[in-house]
């Protein structure tokens, strides 16, 4: 009976997320057009118009709290998280590129945990693959919850399913290529950064930290975003920072995200506050750039009954279409 109660609350929470997500998709969906001066511009689905399009979706935090394991656990002791995505699957699978923000780790060497440390079984990755995600954002403050080995195993788990990730480098941040996906003939670079790692970075050597972690080092971010701008048609940045449960961005967020636009970012999908924060469109060199300061939660057990904040029940599924032309 307890499992059914937990599942019902989870389903209702997911419905709340998706309803707001649909509103978010309608309200925030934008058409971006890159200028053609450098040859980085838009070709096409048809020979006549020579226009190519790429529909990109991204969502807020996927947090597997302790209360959700009861809903996912099966009679044989395995876990099935696929029902958690039931009402979003059709939307996410329809995207040309879907990016999921998985806030946790996947490590068989650590026990399952859902707060303050997060470590889920590999079935969560299976569920995300089944839902239609193509890329996973791991740039968040919980990625070291199972140590560096757990972070690297999380990357490996998604890699095996054909879902590359951002936010953790397998070998060396300074030597690894930026993730660039070719989507319908449009090259899309994706970068992720986290403000910190809940103090667990202290367990890493300075060398391991520099090699593997994608933090908010401005010099490195600037160089990476500028490199992405040169190599790709579109640059998406997913930073994690801000104040939890605050529905307005901090001045630090605003300043840094505008710097990212100046460095070459076209879209910024922000996260971390667990609530939705405002968006804005920025004009740069005659082009439209888009910032959403926080997409909120997508799947979690943060709700009115558990954290006394109804805004944690609301999240966005961003729906952005890019267009590339050759003149």
Residue ranges and their predicted role:
Residues 2-3, 7-327:
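Acidic, metal/ion-coordinating pockets
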């Amino acid at each position: 009976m307890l499992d059914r109660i937990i599942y019902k609350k989870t389903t209702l929470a997911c419905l709340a997320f998706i309803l707001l997500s649909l509103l978010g998709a309608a309200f925030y969906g934008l058409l971006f057009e890159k200028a053609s001066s450098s040859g980085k511009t838009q070709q096409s689905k048809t020979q006549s118009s020579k226009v190519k399009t790429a529909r990109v979706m991204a969502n807020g935090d996927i947090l597997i709290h302790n209360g959700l394991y009861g809903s996912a656990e099966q009679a044989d002791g395995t876990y099935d998280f696929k029902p958690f995505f039931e009402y979003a699957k059709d939307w996410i699978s329809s995207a040309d590129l879907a990016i999921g923000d998985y806030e946790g780790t996947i490590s068989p060497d650590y026990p399952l945990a859902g707060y303050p440390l997060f470590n889920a079984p590999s079935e969560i990755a299976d569920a995300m693959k089944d839902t239609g995600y193509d890329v996973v954002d791991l740039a968040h403050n919980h990625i070291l919850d199972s140590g560096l080995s757990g972070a690297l195993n999380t990357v490996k788990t998604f890699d095996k399913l054909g879902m590359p990730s951002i936010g953790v480098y397998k070998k060396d941040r300074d030597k690894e290529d930026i993730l660039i996906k070719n989507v319908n003939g449009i090259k899309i670079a994706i970068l992720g950064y986290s403000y910190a790692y809940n103090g667990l970075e202290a367990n890493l050597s300075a060398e391991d930290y520099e090699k593997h972690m994608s933090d908010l080092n401005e010099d490195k971010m600037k160089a990476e975003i500028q490199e992405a701008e040169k190599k790709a048609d579109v640059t998406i940045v997913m930073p994690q920072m801000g104040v939890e449960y605050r529905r307005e961005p901090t001045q630090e967020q605003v300043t840094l995200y505008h710097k990212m636009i100046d460095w070459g970012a076209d879209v910024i999908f922000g996260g971390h506050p667990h609530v939705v924060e405002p968006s804005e469109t920025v004009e740069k060199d005659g082009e439209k750039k888009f910032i959403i300061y926080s997409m909120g939660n997508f799947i979690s057990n943060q709700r009115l009954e558990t954290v006394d904040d109804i805004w944690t029940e609301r999240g966005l599924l961003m729906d952005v279409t890019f267009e590339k032309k050759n003149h």
